[in-house]
Swiss-Prot record:
Main location: cytoplasm
E.C. number(s) listed in UniProt: 2.4.99.17
Protein name, entry field: S-adenosylmethionine:tRNA ribosyltransferase-isomerase
Pathway field: tRNA modification; tRNA-queuosine biosynthesis
HAMAP family attached to this UniProt entry: QueA
GO biological process: queuosine biosynthetic process; tRNA wobble guanine modification
Keyword match Cytoplasm: yes
Coiled-coil region: none
A cellular-component GO term for this protein: cytoplasm
Protein keywords: Cytoplasm, Queuosine biosynthesis, S-adenosyl-L-methionine, Transferase
Cited InterPro entries: QueA, QueA_dom1, QueA_dom2, QueA_sf
Organism classification: Bacteria, Bacillati, Cyanobacteriota, Cyanophyceae, Synechococcales
Top-level EC class: transferase
Length: 374
């Protein structure tokens, strides 16, 4: 009993989600064929022999059943990284995060210390005339800068048009290779990315090729999209050791009526709801209303925290990548199968040379592997 209590207490300590990883296992490029990435299949939380490590993403065709509902995140990564020039020709990099008001946008800056309030910037491109920007303020929460863009850049659509002309895909810092920008523009997007607004990819979806999606549909698997625009908070380190009162970033989520009605229908059958990626989990669980004890369509910012002790209302299974230590994504997956079990699986993955992080391999947490609801 004492051991169990200690383990539960550790579930709320950030250091309990740390692990050692050989840097050589951090993937710098994706599998040449999306569905040929390696796949760890977790079937039962307590039986080691039920963890399969000799599979590939294409084997999901054998895992999903006719009538199962698979939810994908159709967000599209914006070319949100901009290179700007100060009056003295010093180059600064901006990462556009979100609109604040009017034509003012919150951006991370590197190096930020050079961007004092009222400092003038110039967005340079060989494709068009220079665009003038101004530092409008400092954001205390992120350390970012509020940047005033031209007066017509007042919505996501107009910003995305500008970024398509001037920007670059904002890759995570651990992806270091010499590939051309055009390579990442394709490989760092899912095959079904249609809704621009993310600053990072929903990476579990990178494993789904067009042919795998087609074969799943032919089998009778229902595939529907939701939208969660992956924000800066997804890769922002957790800065508190005590997780009992953890607060996380807000992200824009849209789950439409069709998806909600399908969730309600599936819940009355023996079929399962499988989320492709942790972003899909966060979106789906956010559409459950505790006030009316039912699922509702949503289109709003959500700040749902999923950590050990959370009771899942929607999701039965999950396809996910291998995540960074001490990350909110690790907390979410731990809520599904338990922290100790997850870290044991990560040790196994490291031993068997699985590739980690955004361009890495995948883990499928099957419905029978989830912790029993209390």
């Amino acid at each position: 009993m004492i051991s169990q209590i200690n383990n539960e207490e550790r579930d709320y300590k950030l250091e309990a989600y740390d692990y050692l990883l050989d840097p050589s296992l951090i993937a710098s490029k994706p599998s040449a064929i999306r569905h040929e990435s390696r796949l760890m299949i977790v079937r039962n939380s307590f039986l080691e022999e039920d963890c399969l490590t000799n599979k590939f993403t294409k084997n999901l065709l054998d895992e999903f059943r006719e009538g199962d509902l698979v939810i994908v995140n159709n967000t599209k990564v914006m070319k949100a990284r901009l290179k700007v020039e100060l009056e003295n020709k010093t180059l600064v990099e901006l990462l556009v995060l979100e609109r604040s008001h009017e034509c003012i946008w919150l951006c991370l800056a590197k190096p930020a210390k050079k961007l004092k309030i009222n400092r003038k910037l110039k967005l340079k491109s060989p494709l068009a005339q220079d665009i003038n920007l101004i530092v409008d303020g400092v954001d205390e929460e992120t350390g970012g800068r509020f940047i005033k863009f031209p007066e017509n850049i007042t919505c996501l659509n107009s910003m995305n048009e500008l970024l398509d002309k001037y920007g670059e895909i904002p890759l995570p810092p651990y992806i270091k290779n010499s590939e051309e920008e055009s390579f990442h523009e394709k490989s760092y997007q899912t095959e079904y990315a249609t809704n621009p607004g993310a600053v990072a990819a929903p990476t579990a979806g990178l494993h789904l090729s067009k042919s795998l999606i087609s074969n799943l549909k032919k089998k009778g698997v229902i595939i529907l999209p939701i939208t969660l625009h992956v924000g800066y908070g997804t890769f922002k380190p957790i800065d508190q050791e005590d997780l009992s009162n953890l607060k996380l970033h807000k992200e824009w989520v849209s789950v439409n009526k069709e998806v909600v009605e399908e969730i309600k229908r599936i819940k009355k059958t023996d079929r399962k709801i499988i989320a492709i990626g942790t972003t899909s989990v966060r979106a789906l669980e956010s559409c459950y209303s505790h006030e009316i004890n039912d699922f509702i369509p949503i289109a709003k910012y959500v700040d749902l925290v999923i950590k050990p002790g959370y009771e899942f209302k929607v999701v039965d299974g999950l396809l996910t990548n291998f995540h960074l230590p001490k990350s909110s994504l690790l907390l979410l997956v731990s809520a599904m199968i338990g922290r100790e079990r997850l870290l044991d699986l990560y040790k196994k993955a490291i031993k068997e040379k699985f590739r980690f992080f955004s361009y890495g391999d995948a883990m499928y947490i099957s419905p029978d592997s989830l912790l029993e609801k209390k």
